[in-house]
């Protein structure tokens, strides 16, 4: 079940500071893949010539922190997020003469038509309250011969985390923001906006060995929403994670995220 999108909640609670997002990013270092998700995306989109790039929903700047130096000479990157806290964090992580930062809303972009060679909307469309408007805006600001890249998650992505939480406490939230724009929804919706779509899928497992990082991830979906769980909820969750780590050497979680390269 999906959660109703409330931009004020996202701006003033979930993403006011970078702490919760960083907790949700940290867990992915336990990937069994030889490359991180950000590296996988870079290898898929293959930026081979200079251009003007817009990233909508830059978050902490994780993608360009890794890849800005790899861009062809003459490239320009505009990193945006609807949270000023996020753009400030991104600016502290990424620097260069060819990068700029702005606060922007994917549903109401202030840029000219056909302004960018590449428009990136990675794991952000489920935050849009009006998906139709957001997708039209992404397409509008992209050049006719440019590309819009979109990533999201499958309904099955990290599902074990939520199923475990729900078993421990019925108050644990299973109405995930991501469920408003999953892979399964994107497969149906995106062809209505783009004539050509190349879909790539990154499916892998996390083998988590740090219990505190695991619990920080769990908290990041509970605390910003002021949801009250039982006093011993995190202790019991810790016991489950600890038990699996003791038995297998790690706590295993499946993740699945698609990339859509749209033209």
Positions of the model-derived regions?
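A short acidic, Gly/Pro-enriched loop at the edge of an enzyme's catalytic core
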Residues: 107-118
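Conserved class I S-adenosyl-L-methionine
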Residues: 1-51, 62-66, 86
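A short SAM/SAH-binding and catalytic strip from SAM-dependent methyltransferases
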Residues: 117-130
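Helix-to-beta-strand junctions that scaffold the AdoMet/dcAdoMet cofactor pocket
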Residues: 72, 128-129, 142-143
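Conserved catalytic/acceptor-binding region of the Class I
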Residues: 132-133, 139, 145-208, 225-231
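Class I SAM-dependent methyltransferase SAM/SAH-binding core
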Residues: 54-108
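Conserved Class I S-adenosyl-L-methionine
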Residues: 4, 34, 60-62, 180-184, ...
């Amino acid at each position: 079940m999906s959660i109703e999108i409330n931009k004020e909640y996202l701006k003033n609670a979930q993403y006011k500071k970078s702490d919760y997002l960083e907790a949700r990013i940290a867990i992915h270092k336990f990937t069994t893949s030889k490359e991180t998700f950000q590296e996988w995306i870079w290898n898929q989109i293959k930026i081979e010539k200079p251009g003007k790039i817009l990233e909508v929903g830059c978050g902490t700047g994780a993608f360009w922190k890794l890849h800005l130096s790899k861009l062809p000479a003459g490239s320009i990157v505009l990193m945006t997020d609807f949270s000023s806290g996020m753009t400030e964090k991104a600016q502290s992580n990424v620097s260069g003469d060819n990068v700029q930062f702005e606060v922007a809303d994917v549903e109401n972009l202030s840029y000219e038509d056909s302004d960018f060679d590449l428009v990136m909307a990675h794991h952000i469309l489920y935050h849009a309250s009006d998906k139709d408007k957001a997708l039209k805006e992404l397409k509008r600001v992209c050049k006719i011969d440019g590309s819009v890249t979109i990533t999201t998650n499958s309904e099955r992505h990290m599902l074990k985390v939520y199923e475990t939480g729900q078993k421990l406490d019925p108050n644990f939230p299973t109405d995930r923001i991501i469920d408003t724009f999953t892979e399964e929804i994107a497969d149906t919706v995106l062809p209505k906006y783009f004539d050509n779509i190349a879909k790539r899928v990154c499916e892998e497992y996390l083998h988590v060995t740090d219990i505190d990082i695991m619990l920080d991830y769990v908290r990041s979906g509970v605390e910003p929403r002021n949801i009250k769980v039982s006093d011993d909820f995190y202790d019991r969750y810790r016991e489950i994670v600890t038990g699996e780590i003791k038995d297998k050497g790690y706590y295993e979680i499946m993740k699945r995220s698609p990339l859509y390269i749209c033209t």
